[in-house]
Design a protein with these regions (language model features):
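Canonical radical SAM enzyme core domain
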Residues: 43-56, 76-112, 117
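N-terminal [4Fe-4S]-dependent radical SAM core
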Residues: 1-25, 34, 38-44
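Flexible loop residues that form catalytic
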Residues: 41, 73, 122-123
Length: 146
């Protein structure tokens, strides 16, 4: 199975969940928040198609501490591929955070069962914050799942 990604930032983020994290930006977004910091990830056609098996292998080799945040774009647009990727990363013992602009209720239970952190809610420019950890606006919720 393939997945469409925008980019990967290896082992350098302190703002996308606890610890130093790698961030996988998935391609495609149905929310398109005003003030989005990653508009290049909006159009699904602009992404790079990769095999999930190849991607998981690359992440396993390059992510030093096994901490990854899956962001976007909007990861839930590729729900089936996202589930498969999370399953593979779980086998490799990754600490997984998922960032979605959707509500918690829209995140499939099979995903919630396999991640450690979840950030929900779309970015609202008027509620932008730099003091609430791991979120961009005050309406967003960051929670530890397990």
């Amino acid at each position: 199975m393939d997945i469409i990604i925008n980019s990967i930032k290896y082992n350098n983020s302190l703002v996308d969940g606890p610890g130093i994290r790698t961030v996988l930006f998935m391609q495609g977004c149905d929310i398109r928040c005003e003030g989005c910091h990653n508009q290049s990830a909006w159009d699904i056609k602009d992404g790079k198609k990769v095999s999930i098996r190849t991607l998981a292998k690359e992440l396993n080799e390059k992510v030093i501490n096994k901490k990854i945040t899956i962001s976007g774009g909007e990861p839930l647009l590729q729900k089936e591929a996202l589930v498969e990727l999370i399953n593979q990363l779980n086998i490799m013992h990754f600490d997984i955070a998922l960032y979605t602009g959707h509500t918690r209720e829209e995140v499939p239970a099979e995903i919630i069962a396999k991640i450690k952190y979840l950030k929900t809610g779309s970015f609202v420019k008027e509620l932008k914050t730099t003091v609430v950890p791991f979120v961009g606006s005050k309406n967003q919720v960051f929670e530890e799942i397990k």
